């Protein structure tokens, strides 16, 4: 009997290998030949699933975004505690999330000058902002306009913290990232509420 190959699963497998290589070596230095060698497939097979490296990067980016969303959805707790844990799920606190951030940064470097990638990045950013807005509104009972403004400040802070941590991990370990996030949350929610309701997740 012929072997049935799951086309989408094979594409995901190749994209995950590409993500590992991009995280370690950078987008410009990674070649389709190198990706093929790392997967154990020929370049012909890889080219069958992806027409070029751009298409590979797009899927690697989407898979990283999906993993981040699963981490956010796994956050438990109520109010500010859930908000804090959800936002922490975006930060590069461990090896897996640092890898995802390396892929995102590679994608952003292309998105800055590429219309298709730029549109994808704007769509993802707006989805993340809307999610943060709903979490802020749920945590603080804020009106829509206030929740949107707070979510924008929070997401801006998260991007800044994350990029510092990716570029200088020795100075930005997980604890410092969490502390910086807590300081930002304290500007959004009443300080005593942040301390009381977020304390449970930091013990």
List the model feature ranges, each with a label.
Residues 117-122, 126, 139-203:
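Hydrophobic/aromatic-rich alpha-helical bundle segments in the mid-to-C-terminal region
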